[in-house]
Protein backbone atom coordinates (compact mmCIF):
# COMPACT_ATOMS: atom_id res chain seq x y z
CA UNK A 1 0.00 0.00 0.00
CA UNK A 2 1.35 3.43 -0.93
CA UNK A 3 2.66 5.61 1.84
CA UNK A 4 1.09 9.08 1.84
CA UNK A 5 2.88 12.20 2.95
CA UNK A 6 1.84 14.18 6.01
CA UNK A 7 2.16 17.94 6.38
CA UNK A 8 4.37 18.89 9.34
CA UNK A 9 2.40 20.51 12.13
CA UNK A 10 4.76 23.50 12.12
CA UNK A 11 3.93 24.19 8.47
CA UNK A 12 0.18 24.11 9.04
CA UNK A 13 0.44 26.27 12.17
CA UNK A 14 2.62 28.79 10.34
CA UNK A 15 0.12 29.20 7.51
CA UNK A 16 -2.85 29.43 9.85
CA UNK A 17 -1.17 32.01 12.06
CA UNK A 18 0.68 34.24 9.62
CA UNK A 19 -0.89 34.15 6.13
CA UNK A 20 -1.07 36.50 4.21
CA UNK A 21 2.20 37.98 5.55
CA UNK A 22 5.08 37.45 3.13
CA UNK A 23 7.88 36.85 5.63
CA UNK A 24 8.18 36.11 9.33
CA UNK A 25 11.40 36.94 11.15
CA UNK A 26 12.65 35.61 14.51
CA UNK A 27 11.09 35.27 16.98
CA UNK A 28 7.89 34.78 14.95
CA UNK A 29 7.23 38.41 14.01
CA UNK A 30 5.73 39.34 10.62
CA UNK A 31 8.33 41.33 8.71
CA UNK A 32 6.94 44.90 8.58
CA UNK A 33 9.16 45.77 5.62
CA UNK A 34 7.16 43.49 3.32
CA UNK A 35 3.85 43.24 5.17
CA UNK A 36 0.99 41.31 3.60
CA UNK A 37 0.94 40.21 -0.04
CA UNK A 38 -1.66 38.73 -2.34
CA UNK A 39 0.91 36.14 -3.42
CA UNK A 40 1.11 34.76 0.11
CA UNK A 41 -2.64 34.84 0.56
CA UNK A 42 -3.26 33.08 -2.74
CA UNK A 43 -0.70 30.33 -2.21
CA UNK A 44 -2.00 29.72 1.31
CA UNK A 45 -5.53 29.31 -0.08
CA UNK A 46 -4.23 26.85 -2.69
CA UNK A 47 -2.88 24.65 0.09
CA UNK A 48 -5.77 25.10 2.51
CA UNK A 49 -8.38 24.26 -0.12
CA UNK A 50 -6.64 20.92 -0.63
CA UNK A 51 -6.18 20.40 3.10
CA UNK A 52 -9.89 21.04 3.61
CA UNK A 53 -10.77 17.66 2.09
CA UNK A 54 -7.70 15.73 3.28
CA UNK A 55 -7.96 12.97 5.87
CA UNK A 56 -5.18 14.58 7.89
CA UNK A 57 -7.40 17.59 8.55
CA UNK A 58 -10.81 15.93 8.86
CA UNK A 59 -11.24 17.48 12.31
CA UNK A 60 -9.98 20.91 11.19
CA UNK A 61 -12.46 21.73 8.43
CA UNK A 62 -14.20 24.53 10.32
CA UNK A 63 -11.01 26.43 11.11
CA UNK A 64 -9.60 25.84 7.63
CA UNK A 65 -12.77 27.15 6.01
CA UNK A 66 -12.67 30.22 8.24
CA UNK A 67 -9.05 30.89 7.28
CA UNK A 68 -9.84 30.51 3.58
CA UNK A 69 -12.64 33.07 3.96
CA UNK A 70 -10.35 35.44 5.86
CA UNK A 71 -7.69 35.25 3.16
CA UNK A 72 -10.07 35.46 0.20
CA UNK A 73 -11.89 38.43 1.73
CA UNK A 74 -8.56 40.18 2.25
CA UNK A 75 -7.52 39.52 -1.36
CA UNK A 76 -10.76 41.15 -2.50
CA UNK A 77 -9.76 44.31 -0.63
CA UNK A 78 -6.67 44.49 -2.83
CA UNK A 79 -8.60 44.32 -6.12
CA UNK A 80 -9.08 47.46 -8.18
CA UNK A 81 -12.82 47.94 -8.65
CA UNK A 82 -12.69 51.27 -10.47
CA UNK A 83 -13.73 50.62 -14.10
CA UNK A 84 -12.09 53.86 -15.20
CA UNK A 85 -8.62 52.55 -14.28
CA UNK A 86 -6.41 50.32 -16.42
CA UNK A 87 -5.82 48.29 -13.26
CA UNK A 88 -9.53 47.40 -13.11
CA UNK A 89 -9.82 43.79 -11.97
CA UNK A 90 -6.17 43.47 -10.95
CA UNK A 91 -4.71 43.06 -7.47
CA UNK A 92 -2.19 45.23 -5.65
CA UNK A 93 0.89 43.14 -4.95
CA UNK A 94 1.03 44.42 -1.36
CA UNK A 95 -0.86 46.64 1.04
CA UNK A 96 1.25 49.72 0.36
CA UNK A 97 1.95 49.04 -3.32
CA UNK A 98 0.40 50.96 -6.20
CA UNK A 99 1.38 48.30 -8.76
CA UNK A 100 -0.98 45.72 -10.19
CA UNK A 101 1.01 42.85 -11.71
CA UNK A 102 -0.28 40.42 -14.30
CA UNK A 103 1.35 37.50 -12.52
CA UNK A 104 -0.46 38.40 -9.29
CA UNK A 105 -3.75 38.08 -11.14
CA UNK A 106 -2.52 34.69 -12.30
CA UNK A 107 -1.89 33.75 -8.68
CA UNK A 108 -5.14 35.10 -7.30
CA UNK A 109 -7.55 33.66 -9.88
CA UNK A 110 -6.96 29.98 -8.97
CA UNK A 111 -7.03 30.83 -5.26
CA UNK A 112 -10.33 32.69 -5.50
CA UNK A 113 -11.84 29.84 -7.50
CA UNK A 114 -10.60 27.40 -4.85
CA UNK A 115 -12.23 29.57 -2.19
CA UNK A 116 -15.44 29.64 -4.23
CA UNK A 117 -15.48 25.84 -4.43
CA UNK A 118 -15.06 25.51 -0.66
CA UNK A 119 -17.48 28.25 0.40
CA UNK A 120 -19.89 28.78 -2.48
CA UNK A 121 -19.40 32.54 -2.15
CA UNK A 122 -20.03 33.95 -5.63
CA UNK A 123 -18.11 37.13 -4.78
CA UNK A 124 -14.92 35.10 -5.17
CA UNK A 125 -16.06 33.76 -8.54
CA UNK A 126 -16.97 37.21 -9.81
CA UNK A 127 -13.63 38.65 -8.67
CA UNK A 128 -11.79 35.87 -10.51
CA UNK A 129 -13.83 36.48 -13.67
CA UNK A 130 -13.05 40.19 -13.46
CA UNK A 131 -9.33 39.48 -13.09
CA UNK A 132 -9.24 37.06 -16.01
CA UNK A 133 -11.72 38.47 -18.48
CA UNK A 134 -11.03 42.18 -17.91
CA UNK A 135 -7.63 42.78 -16.26
CA UNK A 136 -5.58 40.13 -18.07
CA UNK A 137 -7.27 41.08 -21.34
CA UNK A 138 -6.30 44.72 -20.72
CA UNK A 139 -2.73 43.71 -19.90
CA UNK A 140 -2.55 41.69 -23.10
CA UNK A 141 -4.10 44.33 -25.33
CA UNK A 142 -1.86 47.17 -24.10
CA UNK A 143 1.00 45.87 -26.26
CA UNK A 144 1.09 44.27 -29.69
CA UNK A 145 3.03 41.10 -28.96
CA UNK A 146 0.74 38.70 -27.15
CA UNK A 147 1.97 38.13 -23.63
CA UNK A 148 0.89 40.27 -20.69
CA UNK A 149 2.33 43.65 -19.76
CA UNK A 150 4.18 43.22 -16.50
CA UNK A 151 2.23 45.75 -14.42
CA UNK A 152 0.21 48.93 -14.33
CA UNK A 153 -0.09 51.42 -11.48
CA UNK A 154 -3.27 52.84 -10.06
CA UNK A 155 -2.26 56.08 -11.85
CA UNK A 156 -2.23 54.18 -15.19
CA UNK A 157 1.57 54.12 -15.59
CA UNK A 158 2.78 51.00 -17.39
CA UNK A 159 5.57 48.44 -17.07
CA UNK A 160 5.36 46.90 -20.53
CA UNK A 161 7.92 44.09 -20.22
CA UNK A 162 6.48 40.65 -21.03
CA UNK A 163 7.53 38.02 -18.47
CA UNK A 164 7.63 34.30 -19.26
CA UNK A 165 6.52 33.75 -15.65
CA UNK A 166 3.08 34.93 -16.76
CA UNK A 167 2.61 31.50 -18.33
CA UNK A 168 1.48 30.69 -14.80
CA UNK A 169 -1.67 32.68 -15.64
CA UNK A 170 -2.72 29.75 -17.83
CA UNK A 171 -3.78 27.85 -14.71
CA UNK A 172 -6.34 30.46 -13.73
CA UNK A 173 -7.55 30.92 -17.29
CA UNK A 174 -8.09 27.18 -17.63
CA UNK A 175 -9.99 27.02 -14.34
CA UNK A 176 -12.13 29.97 -15.42
CA UNK A 177 -12.97 28.20 -18.67
CA UNK A 178 -14.17 25.21 -16.64
CA UNK A 179 -16.44 27.17 -14.28
CA UNK A 180 -17.55 30.02 -16.57
CA UNK A 181 -18.53 28.26 -19.76
CA UNK A 182 -20.28 31.31 -21.15
CA UNK A 183 -16.94 33.10 -21.44
CA UNK A 184 -14.73 30.06 -22.05
CA UNK A 185 -13.90 31.25 -25.56
CA UNK A 186 -12.57 34.54 -24.22
CA UNK A 187 -10.33 32.85 -21.66
CA UNK A 188 -9.08 30.38 -24.26
CA UNK A 189 -8.22 33.12 -26.73
CA UNK A 190 -6.28 35.04 -24.06
CA UNK A 191 -4.37 31.89 -23.15
CA UNK A 192 -3.65 30.92 -26.75
CA UNK A 193 -2.34 34.38 -27.60
CA UNK A 194 -0.09 34.42 -24.53
CA UNK A 195 1.38 31.01 -25.32
CA UNK A 196 1.81 31.90 -28.96
CA UNK A 197 4.17 34.72 -28.07
CA UNK A 198 5.87 33.58 -24.85
CA UNK A 199 6.72 30.04 -25.95
CA UNK A 200 9.82 30.92 -27.97
CA UNK A 201 11.30 33.03 -25.18
CA UNK A 202 10.55 30.31 -22.65
CA UNK A 203 12.10 27.58 -24.80
CA UNK A 204 15.25 29.65 -25.18
CA UNK A 205 15.41 30.34 -21.45
CA UNK A 206 14.79 34.08 -21.58
CA UNK A 207 13.12 35.82 -18.64
CA UNK A 208 11.29 38.66 -20.35
CA UNK A 209 10.76 40.54 -23.59
CA UNK A 210 11.44 44.28 -23.68
CA UNK A 211 9.20 46.05 -26.21
CA UNK A 212 11.43 49.15 -26.11
CA UNK A 213 14.25 47.32 -27.90
CA UNK A 214 12.23 44.35 -29.23
CA UNK A 215 14.65 41.92 -27.56
CA UNK A 216 14.47 39.07 -25.08
CA UNK A 217 16.48 39.47 -21.88
CA UNK A 218 17.77 37.72 -18.78
CA UNK A 219 19.41 39.17 -15.68
CA UNK A 220 23.08 39.37 -14.64
CA UNK A 221 25.95 41.41 -16.05
CA UNK A 222 26.09 39.28 -19.19
CA UNK A 223 22.37 38.48 -19.20
CA UNK A 224 23.13 34.81 -18.64
CA UNK A 225 21.01 34.27 -15.53
CA UNK A 226 17.40 33.43 -14.80
CA UNK A 227 15.33 33.16 -11.63
CA UNK A 228 14.49 29.55 -10.91
CA UNK A 229 11.06 30.28 -9.44
CA UNK A 230 10.00 32.25 -12.51
CA UNK A 231 10.72 29.22 -14.67
CA UNK A 232 9.14 26.80 -12.20
CA UNK A 233 5.90 28.78 -12.21
CA UNK A 234 5.98 29.08 -16.00
CA UNK A 235 6.59 25.35 -16.33
CA UNK A 236 3.66 24.50 -14.10
CA UNK A 237 1.41 26.87 -16.02
CA UNK A 238 2.31 25.49 -19.43
CA UNK A 239 2.20 21.89 -18.14
CA UNK A 240 -1.32 22.51 -16.85
CA UNK A 241 -2.29 24.06 -20.19
CA UNK A 242 -0.86 21.52 -22.64
CA UNK A 243 0.58 18.60 -20.69
CA UNK A 244 4.08 17.17 -21.07
CA UNK A 245 4.75 18.90 -24.35
CA UNK A 246 8.09 19.12 -26.14
CA UNK A 247 8.47 22.62 -24.72
CA UNK A 248 7.94 21.47 -21.13
CA UNK A 249 10.28 18.51 -21.59
CA UNK A 250 13.03 20.67 -23.05
CA UNK A 251 12.89 23.45 -20.45
CA UNK A 252 12.60 21.10 -17.48
CA UNK A 253 15.38 18.88 -18.82
CA UNK A 254 17.68 21.83 -19.42
CA UNK A 255 17.34 23.30 -15.93
CA UNK A 256 17.25 19.94 -14.16
CA UNK A 257 20.37 18.91 -16.09
CA UNK A 258 22.58 21.64 -14.61
CA UNK A 259 24.90 19.73 -12.29
CA UNK A 260 27.15 20.67 -9.40
CA UNK A 261 30.22 22.67 -10.51
CA UNK A 262 33.59 22.60 -8.77
CA UNK A 263 32.71 25.84 -6.96
CA UNK A 264 29.49 24.41 -5.50
CA UNK A 265 30.00 20.63 -5.19
CA UNK A 266 27.06 20.28 -2.78
CA UNK A 267 24.49 21.51 -5.32
CA UNK A 268 21.91 18.88 -6.26
CA UNK A 269 19.08 19.81 -8.66
CA UNK A 270 17.14 16.72 -7.58
CA UNK A 271 16.42 18.53 -4.30
CA UNK A 272 15.45 21.84 -5.87
CA UNK A 273 16.99 24.47 -8.11
CA UNK A 274 19.42 27.25 -7.43
CA UNK A 275 17.94 30.68 -6.79
CA UNK A 276 19.86 32.04 -9.78
CA UNK A 277 20.86 29.83 -12.70
CA UNK A 278 23.41 30.74 -15.37
CA UNK A 279 21.75 29.06 -18.34
CA UNK A 280 24.51 29.95 -20.81
CA UNK A 281 27.40 28.48 -18.84
CA UNK A 282 25.20 25.79 -17.25
CA UNK A 283 25.99 26.82 -13.70
CA UNK A 284 24.18 27.55 -10.40
CA UNK A 285 24.86 31.25 -9.94
CA UNK A 286 24.40 31.62 -6.17
CA UNK A 287 25.03 29.70 -2.95
CA UNK A 288 21.47 28.71 -2.05
CA UNK A 289 18.41 26.78 -3.12
CA UNK A 290 15.13 28.49 -3.81
CA UNK A 291 13.24 25.76 -2.00
CA UNK A 292 9.84 26.82 -3.31
CA UNK A 293 10.86 25.02 -6.52
CA UNK A 294 10.40 21.62 -4.87
CA UNK A 295 6.79 22.49 -4.15
CA UNK A 296 5.98 24.16 -7.46
CA UNK A 297 7.34 21.22 -9.44
CA UNK A 298 5.76 18.40 -7.44
CA UNK A 299 3.07 17.62 -10.03
CA UNK A 300 5.56 17.55 -12.89
CA UNK A 301 8.00 15.40 -10.94
CA UNK A 302 5.29 13.02 -9.76
CA UNK A 303 4.41 12.40 -13.40
CA UNK A 304 7.81 12.54 -15.11
CA UNK A 305 10.73 12.65 -12.64
CA UNK A 306 9.85 10.35 -9.78
CA UNK A 307 13.45 9.85 -8.56
CA UNK A 308 13.86 13.59 -7.97
CA UNK A 309 10.44 13.79 -6.33
CA UNK A 310 11.33 11.04 -3.86
CA UNK A 311 14.81 12.38 -3.10
CA UNK A 312 13.61 15.94 -2.59
CA UNK A 313 10.99 14.67 -0.17
CA UNK A 314 13.59 12.65 1.73
CA UNK A 315 15.77 15.73 2.18
CA UNK A 316 12.96 18.18 2.96
CA UNK A 317 11.40 15.75 5.43
CA UNK A 318 14.71 15.41 7.27
CA UNK A 319 15.42 19.15 7.29
CA UNK A 320 11.85 20.40 7.35
CA UNK A 321 12.55 23.21 9.81
CA UNK A 322 15.34 24.65 7.67
CA UNK A 323 13.22 24.50 4.53
CA UNK A 324 10.64 26.86 6.01
CA UNK A 325 13.24 29.60 5.58
CA UNK A 326 13.95 31.50 2.42
CA UNK A 327 17.20 30.47 0.74
CA UNK A 328 18.71 27.36 2.42
CA UNK A 329 22.35 26.95 1.43
CA UNK A 330 23.57 23.94 -0.49
CA UNK A 331 25.88 22.71 2.25
CA UNK A 332 23.87 22.57 5.48
CA UNK A 333 20.51 24.17 4.51
CA UNK A 334 21.11 27.12 6.83
CA UNK A 335 19.19 30.16 5.54
CA UNK A 336 20.97 33.05 3.89
CA UNK A 337 18.35 35.27 5.54
CA UNK A 338 16.67 34.22 8.82
CA UNK A 339 13.14 34.70 7.53
CA UNK A 340 10.43 32.11 7.02
CA UNK A 341 8.65 32.59 3.70
CA UNK A 342 4.90 32.05 3.39
CA UNK A 343 5.05 31.21 -0.32
CA UNK A 344 7.69 28.55 0.28
CA UNK A 345 5.88 26.97 3.22
CA UNK A 346 2.57 26.94 1.33
CA UNK A 347 4.03 25.22 -1.73
CA UNK A 348 6.06 22.73 0.29
CA UNK A 349 2.90 21.97 2.27
CA UNK A 350 1.27 21.00 -1.02
CA UNK A 351 4.22 18.69 -1.68
CA UNK A 352 3.84 17.05 1.74
CA UNK A 353 0.06 16.77 1.45
CA UNK A 354 0.07 15.18 -2.00
CA UNK A 355 3.20 13.07 -1.76
CA UNK A 356 2.90 9.38 -2.51
CA UNK A 357 5.87 7.04 -2.53
CA UNK A 358 6.57 6.40 -6.23
CA UNK A 359 5.56 2.96 -7.43
CA UNK A 360 7.39 1.76 -10.54
CA UNK A 361 8.62 -1.58 -11.81
CA UNK A 362 12.07 -0.72 -10.49
CA UNK A 363 10.90 0.35 -7.02
CA UNK A 364 8.97 -2.90 -6.72
CA UNK A 365 12.12 -4.83 -7.62
CA UNK A 366 14.04 -2.78 -5.06
CA UNK A 367 11.50 -3.58 -2.37
CA UNK A 368 12.16 -7.32 -2.75
CA UNK A 369 15.79 -7.45 -3.85
CA UNK A 370 17.39 -4.24 -2.66
CA UNK A 371 19.62 -3.66 0.33
CA UNK A 372 20.07 -0.61 2.51
CA UNK A 373 23.14 1.51 1.92
CA UNK A 374 24.14 4.79 3.54
CA UNK A 375 24.59 7.74 1.20
CA UNK A 376 26.86 10.60 2.24
CA UNK A 377 26.35 13.42 -0.30
CA UNK A 378 29.47 15.37 -1.20
CA UNK A 379 29.59 18.85 0.31
CA UNK A 380 33.08 20.19 -0.27
CA UNK A 381 36.53 19.29 -1.53
CA UNK A 382 39.63 21.06 -0.34
CA UNK A 383 42.23 20.11 2.20
CA UNK A 384 39.86 17.30 3.06
CA UNK A 385 36.66 15.99 1.55
CA UNK A 386 33.50 16.85 3.48
CA UNK A 387 30.25 14.90 3.27
CA UNK A 388 26.75 15.55 4.55
CA UNK A 389 25.07 13.41 7.18
CA UNK A 390 24.17 9.93 6.04
CA UNK A 391 20.89 9.03 4.35
CA UNK A 392 19.53 5.52 4.06
CA UNK A 393 18.97 4.52 0.44
CA UNK A 394 17.92 1.24 -1.07
CA UNK A 395 19.83 -0.23 -4.00
CA UNK A 396 20.73 -3.42 -5.80
CA UNK A 397 24.48 -4.04 -5.65
CA UNK A 398 26.63 -6.17 -7.92
CA UNK A 399 30.36 -6.67 -7.74
CA UNK A 400 32.18 -4.97 -10.61
CA UNK A 401 33.28 -7.12 -13.53
CA UNK A 402 36.57 -6.61 -15.29
CA UNK A 403 34.93 -6.17 -18.67
CA UNK A 404 33.11 -2.98 -17.70
CA UNK A 405 35.67 -1.31 -15.45
CA UNK A 406 38.64 0.94 -16.01
CA UNK A 407 41.08 0.16 -13.24
CA UNK A 408 43.18 2.80 -11.56
CA UNK A 409 46.58 2.10 -10.10
CA UNK A 410 46.35 0.33 -6.77
CA UNK A 411 42.83 -1.02 -7.29
CA UNK A 412 41.56 -4.47 -8.24
CA UNK A 413 38.18 -5.73 -9.40
CA UNK A 414 37.22 -6.42 -5.78
CA UNK A 415 37.39 -2.69 -5.06
CA UNK A 416 34.47 -1.86 -7.37
CA UNK A 417 30.74 -2.31 -7.07
CA UNK A 418 27.92 -1.48 -9.45
CA UNK A 419 24.92 0.12 -7.78
CA UNK A 420 21.42 0.24 -9.26
CA UNK A 421 19.41 2.87 -7.40
CA UNK A 422 16.23 4.90 -7.58
CA UNK A 423 18.05 7.73 -5.83
CA UNK A 424 19.90 10.03 -8.25
CA UNK A 425 23.48 9.62 -7.05
CA UNK A 426 26.14 12.14 -8.05
CA UNK A 427 29.77 11.65 -8.94
CA UNK A 428 32.00 11.72 -5.84
CA UNK A 429 29.19 11.04 -3.39
CA UNK A 430 30.12 8.41 -0.81
CA UNK A 431 28.26 5.15 -0.24
CA UNK A 432 28.76 2.87 2.74
CA UNK A 433 28.00 -0.81 2.34
CA UNK A 434 28.56 -3.26 5.19
CA UNK A 435 31.04 -0.88 6.79
CA UNK A 436 33.05 -0.31 3.60
CA UNK A 437 33.07 3.11 1.94
CA UNK A 438 32.91 3.66 -1.82
CA UNK A 439 33.08 6.76 -3.99
CA UNK A 440 30.69 7.14 -6.90
CA UNK A 441 32.73 7.22 -10.12
CA UNK A 442 30.12 7.24 -12.87
CA UNK A 443 26.35 7.67 -13.00
CA UNK A 444 24.21 6.51 -15.92
CA UNK A 445 20.45 7.16 -15.98
CA UNK A 446 18.10 4.67 -17.61
CA UNK A 447 14.78 5.92 -18.95
CA UNK A 448 11.46 4.43 -19.98
CA UNK A 449 9.30 6.44 -22.38
CA UNK A 450 11.57 9.41 -21.83
CA UNK A 451 11.31 9.45 -18.01
CA UNK A 452 14.23 8.33 -15.83
CA UNK A 453 13.47 5.04 -14.06
CA UNK A 454 16.72 4.27 -12.26
CA UNK A 455 20.47 4.93 -12.16
CA UNK A 456 23.45 2.66 -12.67
CA UNK A 457 26.52 3.85 -10.79
CA UNK A 458 30.02 2.39 -10.70
CA UNK A 459 31.61 2.95 -7.31
CA UNK A 460 35.22 2.47 -6.18
CA UNK A 461 36.31 1.60 -2.68
CA UNK A 462 37.84 4.46 -0.74
CA UNK A 463 41.21 3.19 0.42
CA UNK A 464 41.26 5.75 3.22
CA UNK A 465 37.51 5.49 3.81
Where in the sequence are the language-model features?
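Exposed, low-complexity/repetitive linear segments and helix-based recognition motifs
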Residues: 25, 101, 287, 329, ...
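Short, surface-exposed loop and linker segments with low hydrophobicity and enrichment for Pro/Ser/Thr
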Residues: 338-342, 363-369, 408-414, 449-452
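Active-site-proximal polar cores
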Residues: 358-386
